[in-house]
């Protein structure tokens, strides 16, 4: 099933690129939470939703672009969790750092994850405790790697005082910034060692990257030390968290 989901992510990426490569300035609307949504978000959502319903008609889908009501999903034990276009701000700026995120959740845990960056043509995916990166037709298994000083990856679009204070107290380190769930993937492939997050994220932002990072040997915990949990709840917001190899 993993290969079929990877192909769905590629198909969604193709739909996104049709909008991305257009000559017109990027048009977008604002959702209720003031986050932007574009025609590419909707096109990718449609591709993934139709594909998953064909592939696994018995598994419900929770997508950022059409989340079911709480009453519908409150008892879900197994479901797909999808962000058709993670990093819409990056997409609007045409800076390449946006992804398609697809995760399978079982009993609150992401057991399969696919992250595809369509401009970069890089795919990360994980299942059954193993993680891979595929680029230019070459697939390799990935795992975390220690480095001193550690490289800390942070959000390109979200910074806050808590993060600034945390980094000041961290000790010797280097930083890099990148958009979307690629931050999880940098830790998973050994390019970075830590991704701290204090600002708001939603479950669809993190689930696929979470699966990949853990399969590669990283830990994904909130600031109280608890693993991020995807058991259905009324709010889609995550607590603050960190992805770390330590």
UniProtKB/Swiss-Prot annotation:
The UniProt record lists the keyword Cytoplasm: no
Amino-acid positions noted as binding substrate in the UniProt annotation, renumbered to this chain: 64, 85-88, 205
Residues that bind Mg(2+) 2: 83, 86, 205
The UniProt record lists the keyword Protein biosynthesis: no
Membrane topology qualifier: Peripheral membrane protein
Binding-site residues for Mg(2+) 1, renumbered to this chain: 64, 83, 85
SUPFAM superfamilies per UniProt: Carbohydrate phosphatase (SSF56655)
Any GO molecular function: magnesium ion binding
Entry cofactors: Mg(2+)
Record-level GO BP terms: 3'-phosphoadenosine 5'-phosphosulfate metabolic process; phosphatidylinositol phosphate biosynthetic process; sulfate assimilation
Pfam families in UniProt: Inositol_P (PF00459)
Keywords: Cell inner membrane, Cell membrane, Hydrolase, Magnesium, Membrane, Metal-binding
EC number: 3.1.3.7
Compartments in which it is found: Cell inner membrane
Annotated Gene Ontology cellular component terms: plasma membrane
Reactions mediated catalytically: adenosine 3',5'-bisphosphate + H2O = AMP + phosphate
Disulfide bonds: none
Protein family (similarity comment): Belongs to the inositol monophosphatase superfamily. CysQ family.
Cited function: Converts adenosine-3',5'-bisphosphate (PAP) to AMP.
Protein name (database record): 3'(2'),5'-bisphosphate nucleotidase CysQ
Source organism: Salmonella typhi
Gene: cysQ
């Amino acid at each position: 099933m993993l290969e079929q989901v990877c192909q769905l992510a590629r198909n969604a990426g193709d739909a996104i690129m049709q909008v991305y490569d257009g000559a017109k300035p990027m048009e977008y609307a604002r959702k209720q939470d003031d986050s932007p949504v574009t025609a590419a978000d909707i096109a990718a959502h449609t591709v993934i939703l139709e594909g998953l319903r064909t592939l696994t008609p018995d598994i419900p889908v929770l997508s950022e672009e059409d989340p079911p009501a709480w009453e519908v999903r409150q008892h879900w034990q197994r479901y797909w969790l999808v962000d058709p276009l993670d990093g819409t701000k990056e997409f609007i700026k045409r800076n390449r750092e946006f992804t398609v995120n697809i995760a399978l959740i079982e009993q609150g845990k992401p057991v399969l994850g696919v992250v595809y960056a369509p401009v970069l043509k890089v795919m990360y995916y994980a299942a059954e405790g193993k993680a891979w990166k595929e680029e230019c037709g070459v697939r390799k298994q990935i795992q975390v790697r220690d480095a001193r000083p550690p490289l800390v990856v942070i959000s390109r679009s979200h910074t806050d005082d808590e993060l600034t204070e945390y980094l000041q107290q961290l000790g010797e380190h280097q930083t890099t910034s990148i958009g979307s769930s690629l931050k999880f993937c940098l830790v998973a492939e050994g390019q970075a060692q830590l991704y701290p997050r204090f600002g708001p994220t939603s479950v669809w932002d993190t689930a696929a990257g979470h699966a990949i990072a853990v399969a590669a040997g990283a830990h994904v915990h909130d600031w109280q030390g608890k693993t991020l949990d995807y058991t259905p709840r009324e709010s889609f917001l995550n607590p603050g968290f960190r992805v770390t190899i330590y």
